[in-house]
């Protein structure tokens, strides 16, 4: 947090903590005089994502899809005990596509995280590359496309049944 404090005037931080860690995190920022909006839970994620230049987050499927839909640069920290390592796999896919950075829980230290954050802030073109790659992964019409595929399959099946009748 000391590196954050040194550059605190360059940053606008929103930190979702969950109920359990709220007081400790809020106190840590206050102790270093870092102005951060610390909240147990965020609402209106599309608005929050649109506001952010960099999102530091877990790597659940919904989060990865929201990052892609928002077209935002992300640093993924997959939950290490997620079932079948699905968060790690999601983060690896985003990383391979150039749509995010990846720090495993085993590698996570305050220094590593702040290094990744400032690496991006110091190279705005890297933020843009990650954002563009994330946006390219977005499937905003996925529900419609799935419905179309189901209808297409149903029509093929109905046509086969008519042909054999």
Question: How does the language model describe each region?
Answer:
Residues 126-140:
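A short, well-ordered alpha-helix in the C-terminal region of glycosyltransferases
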Residues 3, 116, 130-133, 149:
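A ubiquitous structural signal for well-ordered alpha-helices
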Residues 45-87:
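A donor-sugar binding/catalytic signature common to diverse glycosyltransferases
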Residues 139-165:
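C-terminal alpha-helical cap of glycosyltransferases
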Residues 1-55, 88-92, 96, 103-113:
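Donor-nucleotide binding loops and adjacent catalytic segments primarily
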Residues 115-118, 126, 143, 159:
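Catalytic machinery of carbohydrate-active enzymes
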Residues 109-122, 147, 151:
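Two-component system phosphotransfer/interaction surface
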Residues 15, 81-84, 110, 137:
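Short, small-residue-enriched loops and turns at beta-alpha junctions
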């Amino acid at each position: 947090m000391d590196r954050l404090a040194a550059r605190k005037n360059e940053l606008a931080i929103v930190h979702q903590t969950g109920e359990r860690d709220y007081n400790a995190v809020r106190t840590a920022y206050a102790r270093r005089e870092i102005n951060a909006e610390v909240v147990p839970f965020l609402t209106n994620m599309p608005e929050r994502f649109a506001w952010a230049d960099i999102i530091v987050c877990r790597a659940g499927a919904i989060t990865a899809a929201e990052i892609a839909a928002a077209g935002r640069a992300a640093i993924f920290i997959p939950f290490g005990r997620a079932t079948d390592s699905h968060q790690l796999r999601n983060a690896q896919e985003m990383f391979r596509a150039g749509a995010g950075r990846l720090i495993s829980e085993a590698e996570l230290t305050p220094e590593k995280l702040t290094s990744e954050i400032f690496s991006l802030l110091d190279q705005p073109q890297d933020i843009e590359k990650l954002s563009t790659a994330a946006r390219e992964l977005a499937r905003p019409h996925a529900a419609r496309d799935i419905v179309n595929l189901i209808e297409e399959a149903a029509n093929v099946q109905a046509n086969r049944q008519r042909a054999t009748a």
